[in-house]
Amino acid sequence: MKTLLFATSLVLAALPAFAQQNCDKPRDDFDGLYCLNKVYIETDAELNQAYKDLAPRLQAEGRARLKETQLAWIEERNAACSRRIDSGFYVNLSCATRSTRKRLEFLQERARECRSAGCQPSKL
């Protein structure tokens, strides 16, 4: 039992390295999907952090505007990058990642602006 547990833990420990290797050269569509999803999740986490970093720098009016534009952006991203069909739904992860990366860069630029010249809610 201890040997089996040890062997299982070795296999589980090797999975992240295996996944990274697969992302360098996906073997099939499922590997590619895994990698696209991984990149999207990482980009989305960065976006969430950028939002959390920017929001406290803004006055109440700016925070309200940020929330409003963020929700509008989410709707636009979803409309552009996903659709429902009879058998389920389709999400274009490349599109979602590009859109998320663009929004991330926008929020990071607004945060830099707040640090250097002061926050300008009209640019949100």
Regions found by a protein language model. Give the residues of each.
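Positively charged n-region of N-terminal signal peptides that target proteins for export
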Residues: 1-4
